Amino acid sequence: MENIAPALLDWFYANRRILPFREDPTPYHVWLSEIMLQQTRVSAALPYYERFLAALPDIPALAGCEEEKLHKLWEGLGYYSRVRNLQKAAKIVCAQYGGQLPADYNALLALPGIGEYTAGAIASISFGLPVPAVDGNVLRVFARLYNDPRLVTDPQVKREFTARVMEHQPPAKAGDYNQALMELGALVCLPNGAPLCEQCPLGTLCRARAAGTALSLPQKTPPKARRITPVTVALVLNEGRVLLQQRPAKGLLAGLWQPVLWEDTTLTAAETAARLAALELDCTGAHFTPLPAAKHIFTHIEWHQSGYFLTVPEQPTPAGCVWAGKEQLEAAYTLPGAFKVYKKLLLTKLL
């Protein structure tokens, strides 16, 4: 196949989105943006990116940030393991590389939370190294470009696609080339049966377009069914404060704060009262008002939430819990997006 780089780069320079991490592509900026964009759209991530950098402008600041502040800066993005790995890597970078990311692909790859794609993006965009950065967008572009019906999730197929990517990469413009492929996949060679083939700079070279198969590519393994998990939530209030409990240090939503809840069960009001009593919480005379049903989807789990709102008298704080007022809920304690329906309700109830 004819080399795609000239047409691709011409298109990219004329059509690329103006993004802050492109205008100032320092290694830290590119790293942070790529971690944020792993599970988040660009438009949604930009406010978080700017807020995060304003609070933590460099890697040493990230390494030294308190965990609760770090979680608060990430609140709303979800997948909190991303930001925990970000800080773990920052601490290693400070200890081993003087607070600056190393200009070496393999050294980047060894850091927590940095996989082949992210290492390639940092190495090529920030350091100009001629290495690949192959994400889902790039796999989709090449599956269609070569009209390749194989599963792009197969490791061997991905290696072959990566080799094809490198065949076309101009070493002196590796970063721009990698970004151009990502941008083409994000703006033109769209997923879910909606490619804008008439706008594609590679349209005359695209074998899937010529064969009429672009809509069926790339082939992917069907996703596994998510496990449905019932969850009972108790919004326990006292004097303008809500009772929060901290999740375990490992596992789903590790270390984050949540309303009092019980997983894998749907409880009646009486059963909820008994569970609260087991936490040594006095609910005598409390009225249990049903909460609206809510649903939250994780990667492999789907929470179906229900529960109750109640007000209790002043009393000792149960072990592993805190009482949080509205100001603390907004500024200090990170409530994951799984509880956004109930957080919105709480903010109307708290003084």
Question: What would you call each of these model-derived segments?
Answer:
Residues 5-7, 11-198, 202-211, 215, ...:
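Catalytic cores of DNA base-excision repair glycosylases
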Residues 1-18, 23, 186-351:
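Intrinsically disordered, low-complexity, charged terminal extensions of DNA damage-control enzymes
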